[in-house]
Regions:
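Active-site-adjacent elements of ketosynthase-type condensing enzymes
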Residues: 129-137
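Short, solvent-exposed loop/turn elements at beta->coil junctions and helix N-caps
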Residues: 60, 126-130, 155-156
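Flexible, glycine-rich active-site loops centered on histidine and acidic residues
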Residues: 96-101, 123
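A short core secondary-structure module
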Residues: 147, 151-183
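Short, conserved phosphate-binding/catalytic loop or strand-edge motifs used
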Residues: 90-95
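A structural signal for short hydrophobic beta-strand segments in well-ordered beta-sheet cores
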Residues: 139-142
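Amphipathic, small/basic residue-rich leader segments at the start of a protein or domain
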Residues: 1-88, 99, 105-116
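A short, Trp-centered hydrophobic/proline-enriched beta-strand micro-motif
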Residues: 117-125, 169
Length: 183
């Protein structure tokens, strides 16, 4: 990409922000993770509708195909403008696992909803008595035919009250050493 192409892209990003980052949305963004789901979804939808929601995803799964410089331009411009943070759990954590390791059925079921923001995810790592010491996880997933039965607790789960789904680390092998047997 030439420097004039990058300059044009930067102008496009600034114009987009000027059009979609309203004063009320900018004020809501100052709350960080405290932003309401409705406000978070409004910004997510605007970025999604522009085709810019997943700059780190492969194009075949809905990514932008941007260069590192384009990603930097977008990231810097939205941060400097005080735009809401796109909730990272689906786009940055769950989506890449699904498009890399998921079945075609899982990709079809989850990736479009992560991209369009209609489903929000949260992470389930910390547990009572173990905090973020993942080797001491007690929540277990026990195989029951084709399914797993999960039993345990998670705490300190950022945005759990706004999420539709949780991705959780669970112990699937109780015989393994503590650092292993976690899925």
């Amino acid at each position: 990409m030439t420097s004039s192409d990058l300059s044009a892209f930067e102008t496009e990003v600034h114009n987009f922000i000027g059009e979609h980052l309203t004063p009320d949305l900018n004020k809501a963004a100052s709350l960080g993770f405290g932003i309401s789901r409705a406000d978070g979804e409004r910004w997510h939808k605007a970025v999604y509708n522009q085709g810019w929601i997943a700059p780190d995803w492969p194009v075949e799964h809905g990514g932008t195909g941007w260069s590192l410089r384009q990603k930097q331009i977008f990231s810097n411009a939205t941060a400097l403008a005080g735009a809401p943070m796109i909730m990272p759990f689906g786009l940055d954590m769950v989506g890449p696992v699904i498009y890399t390791f998921g079945t075609d059925e899982q990709k079809a079921a989850h990736l479009p909803k992560i991209l369009d923001g209609s489903v929000w995810w949260c992470q389930g790592y910390s547990e009572p008595g173990s905090g973020s010491d993942l080797a001491s996880l007690k929540t277990a997933a026990v195989r029951d035919g084709d399914d797993y039965v999960v039993n345990g607790q998670k705490i300190w789960t950022t945005n759990a009250h706004k999420a539709d789904w949780i991705f959780a680390l669970v112990r699937t092998d109780t015989e393994a050493k503590p650092q292993s047997g976690i899925s």
